[in-house]
Amino acid sequence: MINNTVLEFERNEAGSNEGLGDPGVETFSNTPYYSAAKESGQNSKDAMSKGPVKMAFLLHKIKAEQLPLHDSLLETVNHCLNRKDVTENCDSKEKDFFTNAKMILNRAEIPVLEISDSNTTGLVGPAIDGKPFYSLLKGAGISDKPSITSNGSFGIGKDASFAISDLRTVLYSTLYKDASTGIESFLAQGKVKLASHIDSQGVARKRTAWWGYSGFQAIDKHLDVPCWMKRSEIGTSVFSIGFREEELWQHRMAAALLTTFFIAIVDKEMEFNVDNTISITAETISKYFEDPEIAAAAVESGSKEEFEFSKSLYKCYISSDSVDYEKDISASGVGSIGKFQIRVLKQKGLPKRVGFVRNGIFITDNLKNFNHPFRVFPRYSDFIALVSPLN
């Protein structure tokens, strides 16, 4: 058992009432598996050091005594069950959540989903303002991604991992190469988002906590984390504690990965292992686009249209019948936004739509923010077009 780490909630000096309704987490509550796969994939792609980026989505069953913040977390859940919103105002949503959380923590084993990557830079530290590790754990409304062409900014997307945790608890561990010394360095920390409460000493606490060294500090020694959090190669692991293990979760995540990263997969820039049962690579992607269970999972998660659209874009990308064009594109009030490649496939049954990709990732099917919806082409024969920037 790790005994020199602590779970610390911020003091609630203002006495504010903070419930479970965290805006970031709620954003992904309707599509938790799809969102967690997409957002984590974008972060790993942005951190690519060499190809292909290899990502794994693996379910572990961790013994309760191997979860270092277990006792503190259970104690906090009990405090949250004593909140007035639960005991007096009969907030059934909060009561149901914390009752379920208590049940999970009282089990002998706790489900944990690990989302890990390799062939990346890892979450570069140290754990100070201005570094990616700090931005992910403690940043709000800031970006420390390495490039303006990055596909995210550790913004609201980082909350997707909380949406698949029935304990609203996520732990992070990373191994990266220190730029000044060239030495591989380790960092780990955890974050918890519950509700404001009164602790066992009668001190008012906010809903957010960090697990690590005392004083909200990140862990920098492998010896101070359990074995399942250790890293042997450069990269990052994100652990959603109390993972919500619903039926077909693997296929829902696979649908998101195919929808979003099909170009990166074909170009051998990314590979995905989902629960050691689904292995998505350049050689297997066609098979999984035709997999009936993945297609059904896309329907169930409300992403059927996106999945089928990406499937058509994938056909356009790999087909020898597709035709390539180059064009400078301008936007009203902006002027030229650069040179783009437009790849077009004409074939009966295609949806007459245009898809935009960047850095090997599907971004959108329209430019409505630039006054160019590109959604309806009624007078054209069936086609699909794939647009990507060349500069």
Please place each PLM-identified region on the residue numbering.
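Short linear interaction motifs
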Residues: 16-22, 34-40, 91-100, 109, ...
